[in-house]
């Protein structure tokens, strides 16, 4: 799996589920004949194969529960020594399967709807997921990071949800983590921006299954700033690395036994 993949698509099919509309976008070179009629014919053709999905074995992990707990203890020791304030350790799980994994994505869309849903088929591998988080967004001359830290389940009751959100706002651990991530975002944007400010702070946002605390940090790009470099300098997300970010990533590379691959990356 590549670490970075940039694709310039000739055709884009845009679904607007709110308006129940479908828009076709085509990138044409000067003098090139349009291929939209063939694309429209393919869309209208309902003669397509359907494949089932089934798991073919148990869920496994490259490391045992005890090994993962030992890794967490190493992370805690580094925090206690003052090497980092926060470190986010992860563990890989593997599920063998047969059939069409797009069915899993469709199920994910139904049971965990989020602002960002994605499915990419690169031939030899697929990446799909569901996320509420905007890592970095650049519009005109402004860059935005939306740190998310602080999560609790939803109850299904409006009054109870409000109480859960208030408890989340009062939780010292969740607040400490959130403040740290806001500071990281301010620092990351300051490398290429000026007038860096917090637009809103620790705002409870309600999703299908959980309540998150979300802030928004913005900055105006410096006159000589490059937008791509601005994004690169914010990567990876502090929510999946730690603080100070560089030292946390160094320790993660030492502690975790495998590369994270697409996990913790960005889709856009």
Show which residues each predicted segment covers:
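Extended alpha-helical targeting/anchoring segments
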Residues: 1-268
């Amino acid at each position: 799996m590549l670490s970075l993949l940039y694709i310039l698509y000739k055709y884009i099919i845009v679904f607007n589920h709110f308006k129940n509309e479908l828009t076709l976008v085509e990138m044409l070179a000067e003098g090139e004949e349009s291929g939209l009629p063939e694309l429209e014919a393919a869309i209208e053709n309902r003669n397509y194969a359907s494949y089932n999905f089934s798991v073919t074995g148990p869920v496994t992990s490259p490391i045992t529960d005890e090994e993962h707990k030992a890794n967490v203890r190493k992370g805690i020791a580094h925090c206690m020594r003052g090497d980092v304030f926060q470190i986010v350790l992860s563990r890989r799980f593997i599920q063998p399967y047969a059939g069409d994994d797009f069915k899993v994505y469709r199920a994910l869309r139904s049971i965990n709807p989020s602002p960002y849903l994605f499915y990419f088929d690169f031939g030899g591998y697929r990446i799909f997921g569901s996320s509420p988080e905007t890592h970095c967004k650049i519009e005109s001359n402004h860059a935005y990071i939306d740190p998310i830290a602080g999560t609790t389940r939803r109850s299904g009751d409006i009054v109870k949800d409000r109480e859960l959100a208030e408890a989340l706002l009062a939780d010292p651990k969740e607040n400490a983590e959130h403040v740290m991530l806001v500071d990281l975002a301010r620092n990351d944007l300051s490398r290429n921006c000026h007038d860096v400010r917090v637009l809103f702070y620790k705002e409870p946002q309600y999703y299908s299954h959980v309540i998150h605390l979300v802030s928004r940090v913005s900055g105006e790009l410096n006159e000589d700033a490059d937008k791509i470099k601005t994004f690169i300098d914010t990567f990876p997300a502090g929510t999946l690395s730690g603080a100070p970010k560089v030292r946390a990533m160094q320790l993660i590379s030492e502690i975790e036994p495998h590369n994270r691959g697409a996990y913790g990356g960005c889709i856009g």
